[in-house]
Amino acid sequence: MAINLITEYQKKIAERFTLGSLTDEAAGHDYDFTGVKTIEIFSIDTVATVDYTRSGTTRYGNVTELGDTKQSLTLAVDKGFTFSIDAGNASEQFNIKQANRCLKREWDEVCTPEIDAYRLKSWANGKGLSSGKAVLSNTDASLTKANIVDAIFNGSAAMSDKKVPRKNRYLFIPELTFVKFKLADVVMAHQMNKEAVQNGFKGTIDGMKVVTVPSSIWPTLTGGGTINFMIKYKGATVDPMKLKNLRVQKNPMGIDGDVVEGRYIYDSFVKDSACDGIYISTGSTSGGSSVGA
């Protein structure tokens, strides 16, 4: 890694662009992994209704023990990073490498996009789903300005047909694909939210918050195939950030300067009981079981 010592260069740092987290608002944070690596989520069964009988000892029907299903989720992602800022180098670079700022820069530029990419891929591919479970999907081939509006509204309708709540839905769509929506002959401009754009949100479509995603972190199907867009209900997933330790050590043994360290443990899973809360539009028929277990 190069160390560029200062001659007569400017003290101002040329910062790179960052977006902040694109997925955190839509992530599910309802379950606590504190102190454990694996949790088990129970879903309680229901029973069918019967016609009431006005005589006999089974007037309400035959009694059966109420069942349940269990989904085990185990954290698998354990990441870390470290770098040093030597005191001698720092003194010859106008002290432009401030440890705390460099730590924040590392988190914003490297860690946050990595977490976003992992979550998007996990959601789209139904990570953690039990056998026989899958997210909703439809093959729309290549989207154009002529068919993209229909495809998005059909996806929203498919989720509504499965009784997925309309509140807390998010439409994740690549930046360049969203251009096709804006250029569509029938653009629902009056439905677009006029509030200031924050963290990638571009208003709402059919009640869904729009989040445009750079191509660099947009997911593909695990088994091969492209994804046009994804609709997600917030409560459909479990997205723990169990550990996030970021620190600066001043002059640790053997080093004259600062040592920056970071470690974070996280993962992302789709709940069996809420797998209909994710819908993907695919651009190919390959992949099949890649959208579920």
Regions inferred by a protein language model and the residue ranges of each:
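A glycine-rich, hydrophobic loop/mini-helix early in the fold
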Residues: L66-A87, V110-E114, S122-K127
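Short Gly/aromatic-enriched secondary-structure transition segments
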Residues: R54-G61
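Sequence/fold signature of self-assembling virion shell proteins
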Residues: A2-E25, D30-Y52, Q71-A76, F94, ...
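Alpha-helical scaffold segments that mediate packing/assembly in large oligomeric complexes
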Residues: A90-D161, Y279-A293
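Structured, hydrophobic secondary-structure cores that serve as assembly/anchoring elements
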Residues: T46, Q71-K97, I152-L183
